[in-house]
Amino acid sequence: MNTSELETLIRNILSEQLAPAKAEVKGNGIFPSVSEAIDAAHQAFLRYQQCPLKTRSAIINALREELTPHLASLAAESAAETGMGNKEDKFLKNKAALDNTPGIEDLTTTALTGDGGMVLFEYSPFGVIGSVAPSTNPTETIINNSISMLAAGNSVYFSPHPGAKAVSLKLITMIEDIAFRCCGIRNLVVTVTEPTFEATQQMMAHPKIAVLAITGGPGIVAMGMKSGKKVIGAGAGNPPCIVDETADLVKAAEDIINGASFDFNLPCIAEKSLIVVDAVAERLVQQMQSFGAMRLNSEEIDKLRAVCLPEGIANKQLVGKSPATLLEAAGIPVPAKAPRLLIGIVKADDPWVTSEQLMPMLPIVTVSDFDSALTLALKVEEGLHHTAIMHSQNVSRLNLAARTLQTSIFVKNGPSYAGIGVGGEGFTTFTIATPTGEGTTSARTFARSRRCVLTNGFSIR
């Protein structure tokens, strides 16, 4: 018996031990209870551990190929079911998640050698990861997390937002089936028939959930922190955008409009406020109007604030709605050509500036100079360490802002979405773990770093 035949025999024996023939594997990813779903995902993980890396790679490649024809319909269904955002931008987000999320190539191996021998660092899976997906980015988060977590060798229990139930369950079923056809293992990706808040609580407390990956607001992240498990938490953001007097105003205006209007400002990385130096404020606003922004006067801003931010808190019924819908809700006439973004000059303490509203209304605050802009941006970002954007031709100022704000994503002279690999360099992620410090997540985020030491050898220098 040669080495290859021996490896095959051992793998078959281990598979039989981990999944006895008499125990029928049930389910296609969707289960009636949390316990059944997690148990199935755990059994799937035990079998998945025995697969070579090329199996993980085959699954990722198949996902990229087979999900591509469905991205547009998933985007349309997501927008329709949640009532937020628009199908065109959701398609772009789905495509970015599918094409730009790294696979097993992210699991780099590091070796150190010296007189005492060799040290090897490699990434290994955690087990079953409990992933919470939001209603703002439901399908893109599920695609992104599935690729990252499966590439790292884990199985996944998804806890979709109830407001995106139908499209999420449809996508999870598709991913589970693609993975099964690649490796013969059922239930690598699972969820429950009725995703609820109570189901999420049960998942977080389940002993077979090794790690929690939470993409959502501060409340759900805080709940996960109380579980006693390792949490990779993606919380809220309130990204400020600074424009100084050296900026290319035409490019800045276009980039800001593109970023702040993207999916009706639903992405947590999108520009939420604009802080501009007085000297160029009026010219920047005029350029923004030329790219499709509608400037509101103080009376119109007050009307809009009353319906969109009652008592300073975002009206959930208007989150992720179009500019035209916001205008109609406030009783403001909608132009014949609907605007891409609403803008208006406000004071620094306006609720539009101090709260993450997730609406296509960009408040503008004018300041005397760059130092004042940076001070205000630091205050507006509130130490969330999420995202900030700046437009300037002054490299020293750009570096100072990046160092001062300490955000997980800092975009220089581009639209905010360049920070997640859309129209910019780098990989895509929709789980930006700011509260827990991992930042932009990828496959290696969902793996354990392990150290293997061999003494007295393997240094050939």
From Swiss-Prot:
Keywords: Bacterial microcompartment, NAD, Oxidoreductase
Cited InterPro entries: Acetald_propionald_DH-rel (IPR012408), Ald_DH/histidinol_DH (IPR016161), Ald_DH_C (IPR016163), Ald_DH_N (IPR016162), Aldehyde_DH_dom (IPR015590)
Residues in coiled coil: none
Use of this protein: Ethanogenic BMCs can be made in E.coli by targeting pyruvate decarboxylase (pdc) and alcohol dehydrogenase (adh) to them. PduP(1-18)-Pdc and PduD(1-18)-Adh strains targeted to the BMC (PduA, PduB, PduJ, PduK, PduN, PduU) make significantly more ethanol than strains where Pdc and Adh are not targeted to the BMC.
NCBIfam families linked: PRK15398.1 (NF011927)
Assigned protein family: Belongs to the EutE/PduP family.
Subunit structure as annotated in this protein's UniProt entry: Interacts with PduK, probably with its BMC-containing N-terminus. Interacts with shell proteins PduA and PduJ, interacts with PduQ.
Protein name: Propanal dehydrogenase (CoA-propanoylating)
